[in-house]
């Protein structure tokens, strides 16, 4: 259980509550509540996870939209979180592709495929890292190895021969997790998805430590369908067993039965 899990669950909880309340409220009232959600999920005026509480709320705002199946907005123009709510409120509406999205201003722009010397370097006499480098990119500064990134071609030979494992291969977590080599970098060094290659497996989402990658959901539309009397059949993925903690299987089974009984009344 991580901070990312907590935020994700808070967003889903609030969006679900909003969907159930919609049956008794106008679109304008729900839109007003949507605008208040980032302040409810991220209270106070002191940042908890990032350098600014405003950034935290902006990211949560994008997560709220994606949880409702709506497209991201970005921060380059003035828009409200609730823009497009009326269209998204229809139970038959499908989320707008792509499924997997990168919140650019949440991305840490992690370095990718970079070799760096750590403080584990012993400054040994043999200097195998320097001797094997085909581009003469390694020198010694204060008796410690130093890699010139302008010359380095990321061949990894120094990494392989260091007897102290003092050279670290830094890779971007989301890119390392992607089996389709679909993640590159934009002009600012932030992660960027090539949707021609992406298969929406979600591995990048799971492995991003900054929670900058999120998927779209239709929980809002599903609840609308339930409220309006549509026949909704839940199909539970087997993976749910490991997602809600110990002792949750029986409780969830009873919850599903209760939902069904509520619909039949």
Residue ranges with predicted function:
Residues 149, 194-197, 237-243:
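Conserved short loop/turn motifs at secondary-structure junctions
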Residues 222-232:
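Glycine-rich phosphate/diphosphate-binding loops that line cofactor/substrate pockets in enzymes
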Residues 1-161, 165-177, 181:
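Ferredoxin-type iron-sulfur electron-transfer modules and their immediate structural context
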Residues 155-156, 190-202, 213-217, 221-223:
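Terminal amphipathic helices with adjacent charged low-complexity linkers/tails
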Residues 264-265:
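Conserved small/polar residues in nucleotide/adenosyl-binding loops
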Residues 246-260:
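Conserved, compact domain cores that house catalytic/ligand-binding motifs in diverse enzymes
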Residues 141-146, 186-194:
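Short linker/helix segments within small regulatory modules
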Residues 209-216, 232-243:
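Core AdoMet radical
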């Amino acid at each position: 259980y991580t901070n990312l899990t907590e935020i994700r669950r808070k967003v889903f909880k609030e969006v679900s509550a909003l969907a159930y309340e919609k049956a008794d409220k106008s679109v304008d009232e729900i839109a007003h509540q949507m605008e208040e959600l980032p302040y409810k999920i991220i209270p106070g005026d002191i940042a908890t996870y990032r350098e600014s509480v405003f950034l935290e709320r902006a990211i949560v705002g994008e997560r709220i939209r994606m949880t409702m199946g709506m497209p991201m907005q970005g921060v380059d123009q003035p828009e409200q979180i609730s823009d497009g709510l009326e269209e998204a409120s229809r139970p038959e509406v499908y989320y707008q592709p792509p499924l997997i999205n990168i919140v650019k201003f949440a991305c840490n722009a992690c370095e990718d495929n970079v070799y760096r010397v750590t403080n584990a370097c012993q400054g040994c006499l043999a200097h195998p890292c320097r001797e094997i480098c085909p581009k003469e990119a390694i020198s010694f500064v204060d008796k410690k190895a130093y890699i010139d990134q302008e010359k380095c071609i990321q061949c990894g030979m120094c990494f392989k021969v260091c007897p102290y494992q003092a050279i670290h291969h830094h890779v971007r977590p989301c890119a390392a997790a992607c089996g389709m080599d679909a993640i590159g970098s934009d002009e600012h060094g932030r992660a960027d998805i090539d949707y021609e290659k992406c298969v929406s497996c979600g591995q990048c989402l799971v492995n991003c430590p900054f929670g900058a990658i999120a998927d779209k959901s239709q929980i809002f539309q599903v609840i609308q369908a339930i409220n309006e009397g549509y026949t909704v059949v839940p199909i539970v993925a087997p993976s749910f067993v490991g997602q809600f903690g110990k002792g949750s299987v029986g409780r969830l089974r009873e919850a599903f039965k209760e939902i069904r009984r509520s619909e039949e009344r």
